[in-house]
Amino acid sequence: DIPPEMNSTFSMLRLPPFPEIPEPFRGGFWARVCLAWTGDTEAGEKLLAPLREAAPVVIDTVEEMDYAAVDRIYLDPQDPLPARESCTLLRELTPRAVDAFLDQAGPAAGAGDYPLLMVEIRHMGGALARPADVEDAVCARDAEYLLEAVGVLAAPPMAEAVEHATR
């Protein structure tokens, strides 16, 4: 169970060998965990400790920050990219769904010509699941997770592959 003060994502990244991407990430396959925590610092550190121990950590950017700086959590590119994104909401994350995620986005999926830059599962729930005090346009508050796939539309054959993969 994740407290409502935490937002978390798990991503599979296949980064292109572009010079703009810093080493050691350039041209590699990476698993990424991103977190935002709005609670007590000590409680957040306790929740984070098992993640830090679960696997080798290449970069740890967890820090206290102002709300205006939260865009740094994902380390996304600051310049626009020609990309296509597809998202779907999941009410639950079953073992079967995790297996499908790993089959389709994990290290063994389509090595070399894999069209997607990132496939991510984002935990929703928490405060987002609570009904608003006033009427709003937020739907599907019962969705616990968001599944997102992103591909860069680099050249026509890759653009077609990304188009197909994000359907």
Predicted regions and their residues:
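Soluble FAD-dependent oxygen oxidases
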Residues: 1-167
